[in-house]
Amino acid sequence: MCRWFRRKKQGQPQLTPAPVPNGEDYWNSKYPKTVVVYEGRELPNTGMIAVDVRDFFININDYQLQEVAQKLQGLSDDEKALECLRWVIANITYVADKTEYGLEEFWCYPNELLKTKKGDCDDGAILLANLMLAAGLPYWKVRLTAGAVPEGGHAYVTYYYEDGSRWVALDWCYFPNVDAVKDRPDYKNSPIYLEVWFSWNLKYAFCAGVKGEITLKKVRFL
C-alpha cells in the first residue's frame, strides 16, 4: 500500500498525510537510543574518567550561561543559534588540551570553559550547545556531534534549521562559518563532516546501529 495514505475498511479511501519528519518525537526515535559513556576527561595521577556524554549539558539557569543568553531575547531560533555561535567564536580561544592542561584529552564543562576562555573543539561545542539551550532553543533541535573530519576526530554542534528542512553544522573552530543558518547546507552533504560516530542531546544519545550502553575509549579530538 502506498505509504502516503491508509485506506479505510469501508467506504471511500481517504488520504492521510504521512508523518512529517520535523518534530521532537520523530527525531528522538529515528535512530536507536544509546547510553554513550566516553572516556573524555583525563585527570593528573588518576587517568581517564568515563562520563555519560549527556552530563555535559548543565543547568540552563546557570548564571554564566544566562549572562549571554539574556541578550538574545526576542530573536528567532535561527538567530539565537547564530548569535551563540558568534559569541563562542569571538570569546573562546582555541588551545589544545596538551597545551592548556598537559593532558591528551580533557572535555570541559561549560562553566569551566567560561572561566578559562581557552579550549579545543569539544570544549567550545559543549559550551555552544549549552548556550543555545539557555537561550531557549528546544533541546531536541540541538545536538552535540562527534565524528570524523579530514584531519581526524572532531566535535561540533548540529542544529535543526527552523523551517524543518535539514540539520546544519555550527562549528566554532575547525570550520568557523558565521553565515546565516538559512544559507547553510545539510551537514550530511558536506565534504568536511565525513562520518558521525555518535551524537547526543539533553535527554538522549545516538550511535548508529547500537542499542543499550556503549563505552568509548579515548579518541583524539582536534
Residue positions per predicted region:
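A structural boundary/capping signal
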Residues: 1-222
